[in-house]
Amino acid sequence: PQGSGQGQGGQSQADQSQGLQRQLEELTLVFSALFGPVRLTDLITPHRLSGSVKLPGQGSVASIWSKALKELLTQQLSGHVVVDLRSAEYGAMYRPTRGSDCLLLNIGVAKVNPATGKRSVVSHWAKHTRGLLAGALLRAVAGGQLAASDGDVDEILQVAAGLEGVKEVEITPLDARGQAKVTLVL
């Protein structure tokens, strides 16, 4: 039916919002030190446990999860490009095995001090900037500008470079485990 376009515009936004929600639910894993990797729709009890906590005779929580998740996640992530927004503490819970065909892009954030010109890692802005990147990537997938199943590294880096405040994006060569460090320079 013909209309003024106002309702159609609203419907389009609603469809985009639903598409974004679907992508968020399907593509996002959150790492919990207590429960391991969980989906956003998983119901879990409120808790406080750090991955660095050491359990008597067993090592750190992160090392316990690392052993438990190594094979499972390596199989599940096989053939995929993973944008890893975890902090170092949670990053220790899973790393791809050597020879894995999963490509893991570990996202870091650095800021240049205008007075000295020196770069430093900024944990204060890292979580915020990683959140902006997650939102931008999910919108790109929901909008059809980025493939979810076989994401192209160059396209992911372009999305990162387009974030407000990002002045430069750097990537290291892949290591033997299929990991590369991507640094967003603010």
Cite the ranges covered by each PLM segment:
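Internal, well-folded beta-alpha domain core
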Residues: 4, 12-186
